[in-house]
Amino acid sequence: MTKTVLVYGSGISGCGAADALAKQGCRVLLYSDKETKIDNALLELLKKQGGGLYCGNGETLLQEVEQIVLSPGIPLANPLTDMAVQMGIEVISEVEAAYRSYHGHIIGITGTNGKTTTTTLVGEMLKTLPVPTAVGGNIGQALSKEVENLGADAWLAAELSSFQLEGVREFRPDVAVILNLTPDHLDRHHTMEAYGAAKCNIFKKQRENDIVILNYDDPIIRSWGELAPSRVCWFSRREQLNRGVYLNGGNFTIAWDRQLYTVCHKKDLRVFGGHNEENVLAAIASCFFAGVTIENMRRVLLDFTGVEHRLEYVMTVNGVPYYNDSKATNPDSTIKALEAFDGHIILLAGGHDKMTSLEPMMKLVQAKADVLILLGEAKERFYEAAAAAGVGDIRKVETMDEAVELAYKLAAAPQVVLLSPACSSYDMFENFPARGRYFKNLVAALPK
C-alpha cells in the first residue's frame, strides 16, 4: 500500500523532501499555510503519485496522512502538528526523513555559530577520501536531495540547526559535533534549556562506538559529555588535553589512543580569528575519525579561504579594508568578529531583533569600535544598549545604502569597516546572503 506523507513547508527543504519521497514511491501532499507556487516538474511528479500542492487549511488533509515531515521553518509545536500527534500521526523533521533513506556515514555538525564554516571545511577534507562524499542540511540543498544517490560507503557532512534537530527521532550520526552554545532563536525555543535540548538531540541516539566531539572550553557543552552514550572527543583552544584536539604552541594537535599528531600551525591558515581556530579544531577532530590523513587535512587547511558572508574580506578602499560578516545573526557571532580585529572598527549593526542580551557585545563595541552605525528594526534598542555601555560615537541610519555611505565618509586608515549585524535580516532583506551581497555591491561602487 502506498504511504501518504504530508510535507509541511514549501521552501528548499520542503520541496527537496517532497521530491525525494515521491521518487521513493510515496504519495506526497506538499502543504503550505499560504498560497505559493512550486516548480512545475515537481508538481507533475507529485500529481503522478496521487499527491500535489495544497495551501490553506491543512487539517482537512490529516485523515489521509500517515506521517508529517516538517521543514526547518515550521515549529514542532503548531496547531496542525498538535492535532496530528493527537491522531497518532508521526511528526518528523526533514533531516530525520533523509536519514531514514540513507545508509552511509554521517558527520553531523551543530552549534550556535561556526556551523557553515566547519561543515564546508569538513566537506573539503572528506573529498580526499576514496569514496563518494556530500555536504548538505542547513547549507546548500535539502539533505533529502543530497543523500539520494549515495551508497553505504559514502560520507556526508551535515550542517544541522536547532530547528532541524528538534524533530529527529532515530537520527544517529557516526560523528556528532557541537561547536558552541550562546543565546539565539529564543523567539522560537523560548528558553536556553529548550534550545540546548534541541542541540543535544544530535547525539542522543548514538551508540558506544560512535563519536561526539564537544567544545571543552564551553562549560555547558562540557557538562553534556556525561550525557553522551558515545565516545567523547574534546576540542579546546585554551587547554592542552590528554585526549582530544587542541592548540599546542600554536600547532593544531591530535591526542588519541596514546598517539600525538601535528596537523599545522595556526599562522599557516588563510582564515583568521579565534572562532576560526575553534572551527578548524572541530573539523580536524571530525575528519580524523572519518579516516582523512593528516597530510590531506593539512593540505586542505592551507588552501581554505573561508566561506562567503563569514568575516569575508571584500576590498580595500582608500586604505580602509571592508569586511562582510552578514552571517553574524546574533550578538555572540558579532563578538567573535570584533575579537578578530585589534580595534579601530567602524561597525555596521542592526536588523531584525531577536531580543537577545546585548550587554557583552556592547562592552566589546565600546572597547574596539570607533563608530557604531545602526540600522533596521533593532536600532533603537541597540542604541540604548550601546549608550549604556559607554559607546562614544553612535549613528542611526535608515538603509544599508546610508550606512555604507556614512562609513565611507568617516573611515580612514588604520580603521576597518565591518558589517556584522548581530541580527537576522528579515526586516530589510530576504536572508543574510542577500544582505551580504547587497553590502558588497555597495562597497564595490564606492569612489576609489
Positions of PLM-derived features:
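Residue-level signal for inorganic ion chemistry
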Residues: 21, 68, 109, 138, ...
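Short, basic phosphate-binding NTP loop
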Residues: 1-108, 129, 302, 308-312, ...
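Phosphate-binding loop of NTP-binding sites
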Residues: 4, 22-23, 61-63, 72-216, ...
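C-terminal helical cap/extension that packs against the catalytic core
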Residues: 42-47, 359-415
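Nucleotide phosphate-binding/pyrophosphate-handling subdomain across enzymes
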Residues: 3-4, 16-24, 132, 264-370
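Residue-level detector of alpha-helix initiation sites
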Residues: 12, 75, 113-117, 277, ...
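Short internal beta-strands
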Residues: 27-34, 212-216, 348-349, 368-377
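Beta-strand->loop->alpha-helix junctions that form or flank phosphate-binding loops
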Residues: 56, 92-96, 229-247, 298-302, ...
